[in-house]
Swiss-Prot record:
Assembly with partners or alone: Homodimer.
UniProt KW rRNA processing keyword: no
A Pfam family recorded for this sequence: Trns_repr_metal
Annotated TM spans: none
Listed name of the protein: Copper-sensing transcriptional repressor CsoR
PANTHER family, per the entry: COPPER-SENSING TRANSCRIPTIONAL REPRESSOR CSOR, TRANSCRIPTIONAL REPRESSOR FRMR-RELATED
Length: 117
């Protein structure tokens, strides 16, 4: 595995550094007893930024490590690892999840039964 950052990892790193600064600002807001709704809005903004960083990392993983694992015959292990990594990430796996504009499909068992023609 390369130790040089990909463009996507660099983008995720920049997002995280921005989020860290934003969190520092929210802490200052709380310390100065800012209005709760204002704090909540800022927390939502940071949460969105973290979710975007996570999507960037997912795309990076799919383009690098995951595709290499599939090409090396380790596809099922890579799939299992990826499922484990995203199972607690509603922004990636929830019913309204979108990855680059594509809606995440339901597993085949979740499809409604079709009536015979």
């Amino acid at each position: 595995m390369s130790h040089e950052l990909t463009d996507k990892k660099r983008a995720a790193l920049n997002r995280l550094k921005t989020a860290r600064g934003h969190l520092d600002g929210i802490i200052r807001m709380l310390e100065s007893d800012a209005y709760c709704v204002d704090v909540m809005k800022q927390l939502s903004a940071v949460q969105s930024s973290l979710e975007r960083a996570n999507r960037v990392m997912l795309h990076n993983h799919l383009e690098t490590c995951f595709s290499a694992a599939v090409l090396d015959g380790r596809g099922q292990a890579a799939i299992d690892e990826l499922i484990d990594a995203v199972k607690f990430t509603p922004a990636l796996t929830g019913p309204q999840a979108q990855l680059g504009g594509a809606v995440v499909c339901k597993p085949p068992g979740d499809q409604p039964a079709q009536s015979p023609a």
